[in-house]
């Protein structure tokens, strides 16, 4: 029995807690001890009710990593309820979405975590769920764009968020639809001027970018890498100056 307990404590990285007063340790440490207690019974299935509640980010990640390892190496089925949909998306093999007293959706994460599905499930009408980042975004600031952002490769994301926090409507472009900046710009920008991936920027797309940019009070340019396909972005930057 002592060997089983030692192995369980080791599995959840709680060896140093064996002689501690349970009431004196942190919430994250308590969760690990309780999990070790369950493992001692050598179950085939573990059911957990919101195991990450009241835990800080470090302990949430640590606990979920332990559960993943248990599922893979010890072949224990882990069933748990979570309100953090970003974590559920990253850690789960199958998802059950409960709305009221009804199972609204069931499937693999990539089948369930879609923008329209999450919007309907939680009745979101003042923001967005981004399935690419697994994040919740506040609503875009409406109105005529005051700032035009020229960016690429993730360099625009902190700028988009800052403008959104300052309630400044903005436009973004020219972005390819497979650019990571596009994934957030489409949710937060008033208008996004886009081009299809791996194509040279068309006259129509370039003209629209110039038109929108000229109406803005300011232009923000990040360190945009320019290549053969997007070389007209360089021309757009020169016009901005």
Give names to the regions the model predicted:
Residues 123-201, 221-222, 227-230, 241:
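ABC ATPase nucleotide-binding domains
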Residues 61-74:
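Helical segment within the ABC ATPase nucleotide-binding domain
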Residues 46-50:
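Catalytic Walker B motif of ABC-type/P-loop ATPase nucleotide-binding domains
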Residues 1-18:
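Conserved ABC ATPase "signature" region
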């Amino acid at each position: 029995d002592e060997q089983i307990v030692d192995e369980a404590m080791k599995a959840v990285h709680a060896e140093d807690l064996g002689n501690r007063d349970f009431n004196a340790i942190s919430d994250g440490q308590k969760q690990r001890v309780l999990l070790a207690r369950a493992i001692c019974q050598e179950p085939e299935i573990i059911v957990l009710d919101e195991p990450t509640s009241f835990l800080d980010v470090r302990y949430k990640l640590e606990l979920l990593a332990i559960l993943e390892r248990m599922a893979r190496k010890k072949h224990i089925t882990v069933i748990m309820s979570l309100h953090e949909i970003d974590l559920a998306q990253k850690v789960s093999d199958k998802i059950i979405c409960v709305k009221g007293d009804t199972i609204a959706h069931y499937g693999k994460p990539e089948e369930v975590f879609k923008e329209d599905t999450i919007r309907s499930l939680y009745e979101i009408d003042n923001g967005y769920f981004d399935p690419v980042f697994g994040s919740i975004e506040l609503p875009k600031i409406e109105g005529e764009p005051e700032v035009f952002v020229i960016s690429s490769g993730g360099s625009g994301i902190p700028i988009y968020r800052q403008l959104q926090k300052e309630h400044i409507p903005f436009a973004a472009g020219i972005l390819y639809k497979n650019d990571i900046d596009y994934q957030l710009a489409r949710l937060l920008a008033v208008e996004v001027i886009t081009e299809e991936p791996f194509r040279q920027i068309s006259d129509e797309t370039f003209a629209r970018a110039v038109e929108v940019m000229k109406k803005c009070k300011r232009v923000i340019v990040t360190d945009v890498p320019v290549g053969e396909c997007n070389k007209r972005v360089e021309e757009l930057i020169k016009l901005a100056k």
